[in-house]
Amino acid sequence: DGTLIGDSNGIYRTDENGEILISGLQPGKSVVVTETQAPPGYLIDTQAQTVQIKEGRTVSLNFKNQPKGELIIQKRDSATGQPLAGAQFRVTTAAGCEVGLDGVIGDSTLTQNGIFTTDSSGEIRITNLAPGAYVLTEIKAPHGYVMDAPSTNVVIGEGGDTQTVVITNTPKGGLVINKLDSVTHEPLEGVEFTITEAD
């Protein structure tokens, strides 16, 4: 009949063994059990279970929670493989919803401006991710580097899947012009050049 059983909200909480024992239920009634909150780091079991209470019997129900996944972004120099700090990324679901530092999707848990920055070891770690497709968009390369690919797709699988994505940046190039005396090979000061991009 929809009447709540338990505390004033009809809520029971598991003990240290992950169990709840409910006694004194009236035989012949059907009870619907719905998980309303998963433990930290786990996905909620959305499947409600209905059970018929029988006189003198204790019925067991099992709910299973899958661990959430983790994403590790590693930023590296494309030539040397050295880690790069200071790269900035925006992480979204395939549907375009922004992901926060703790993996929760929505406005309340976003990092500052929704941007993740690689640390001194060139990494970003995001935990508590639900299985699904994500898009990593590099919005700023580290100083002295150019972006090789602005977006990378990654899929977090079920069962606590951890995905490590290595994204590289190419160091910016340089140009050295030497102006020398053709006879003495001494450097010549004050010479002007015009530099343009080739077609």
Language model regions located:
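Solvent-exposed loop/turn and edge beta-strand elements of beta-rich ligand-binding domains
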Residues: 1-199
